Swiss-Prot record:
GO biological process, one term: protein transport by the Tat complex
Name assigned to this protein: Sec-independent protein translocase protein TatA
InterPro entries assigned: TatA/B/E (IPR003369), TatA/E (IPR006312)
GO CC terms of this entry: TAT protein transport complex
Compositional bias of kind Basic and acidic residues: 75-86
Organism: Prochlorococcus marinus (strain MIT 9215)
Localization (cell): Cell inner membrane
Keyword match Transmembrane: yes
A Pfam family the protein falls into: TatA_B_E
Function: Part of the twin-arginine translocation (Tat) system that transports large folded proteins containing a characteristic twin-arginine motif in their signal peptide across membranes. TatA could form the protein-conducting channel of the Tat system.
Compositional bias segments (type: Polar residues): 65-74
Transmembrane segments: 3-23
Disulfide bonds: none
HAMAP family tied to this protein: TatA_E
Amino acid sequence: MNIFGVGLPEVTVILILALLIFGPKKLPELGKQLGKTLKSLKKASNEFQNEIDQVMNEEDESPKSIESNQTNEINQEKIDSENSKK
């Protein structure tokens, strides 16, 4: 078991110290608060990643739409040029 670079012996020592410092009555409350904090951090991280992905997708699509618009304009100019020759 290796969570955040902390192995099982280290986790055991941390839990024993927490038990000694906070006592058995406050540990469930602290665990609950820690869980809520980790959940909100994960949610914020996911939202941030989604925003980055959205911006990257917009940047990827922008050159395609510009190229498409330019191609359409060139084709329209060719058609107009051919029509004016007739």
